[in-house]
Amino acid sequence: MSHNFHVIIPARYHSSRFPGKLLQEINGITVIERVYRQALLAEPKSVIIATDHDEIADRAIQFGAEVVITSHTHQTGTDRIAEVIAKGSFAPDDVIVNVQGDEPFIRPKLIQQVACSLTKTKAPVSTLCWPISSLEILNNPNVVKVVCTRDNHALYFSRSAIPFHRDDKNAYSNTFRHIGLYAYRAAFLLEFVSWPPCTLEQIECLEQLRILWSGFSIRVDEACEEPLQDINTKEDLILAQQYFLDTFNV
């Protein structure tokens, strides 16, 4: 049974920290194929890989994926997804889930959760968060933090430690990290990418701040399952390979 949403996976080859990571293998299967397989398990109406790289496109076609070739000038995965929507036959209200191409163990239930959340909110975007479990994570600028209203809408996203525990600098209770999984309405996504980057976005290097800056809301739900590590570095790949061996007893 398919659900009423589409998954688009932006797949960029030239990552700044780990170029070519999507074509690295975990037990003989590339990272991008593992992401694609996990997305299929969420039972969406379609799964599309959006890329500007010939080798990624060729490999994706070989394992049976629908591929859309996009411009090489895009600065973000969201821009790449918007091109797919503009080229396709999506309805304005279609739910589009942005699944990052470097998450080989993305949980299908999280994809379903973020898509379902969008259908139950007036916000044009939904995303997820997870409780922070250590001071090290809280103070890591590569981990994006989010603070929310009492009705689960984002107040702010930051690479800094928010909220700041004034009276106990070693505390991390009631802090949440953002999970980079988004659902949007197709029409809103096209509108979003037409806006110029805002000041806060440029300072933090977080494009979702453009949405808040422009006066729109983002629904944020706590993930129903703990998210697993994405792959940003060679060290992350080694950890992912070991996780696979440990989990599946290969």
Curated annotation (Swiss-Prot):
InterPro entries (alphabetical): Cytidylyl_trans, KdsB, Nucleotide-diphossugar_trans
Molecular function terms from GO: 3-deoxy-manno-octulosonate cytidylyltransferase activity
Root EC class: transferase
Glycoprotein is among the record's keywords: no
Entry keyword set: Cytoplasm, Lipopolysaccharide biosynthesis, Nucleotidyltransferase, Transferase
Pathway stated in the Swiss-Prot or TrEMBL entry: Nucleotide-sugar biosynthesis; CMP-3-deoxy-D-manno-octulosonate biosynthesis; CMP-3-deoxy-D-manno-octulosonate from 3-deoxy-D-manno-octulosonate and CTP: step 1/1; Bacterial outer membrane biogenesis; lipopolysaccharide biosynthesis
Cellular component, GO, one term: cytosol
EC number: 2.7.7.38
Reaction catalysed by this enzyme: 3-deoxy-alpha-D-manno-oct-2-ulosonate + CTP = CMP-3-deoxy-beta-D-manno-octulosonate + diphosphate
Localization (cell): Cytoplasm
Coiled-coil positions: none
Pfam families: CTP_transf_3
Keyword Cytoplasm among UniProt keywords: yes
Function: Activates KDO (a required 8-carbon sugar) for incorporation into bacterial lipopolysaccharide in Gram-negative bacteria.
Similarity field: Belongs to the KdsB family.
PANTHER family the record matches: 3-DEOXY-MANNO-OCTULOSONATE CYTIDYLYLTRANSFERASE, 3-DEOXY-MANNO-OCTULOSONATE CYTIDYLYLTRANSFERASE, MITOCHONDRIAL
Alphabetized NCBIfam families for the sequence: kdsB (TIGR00466), PRK05450.1-3 (NF003950), PRK05450.1-5 (NF003952), PRK13368.1 (NF009905)
Protein name (record): 3-deoxy-manno-octulosonate cytidylyltransferase
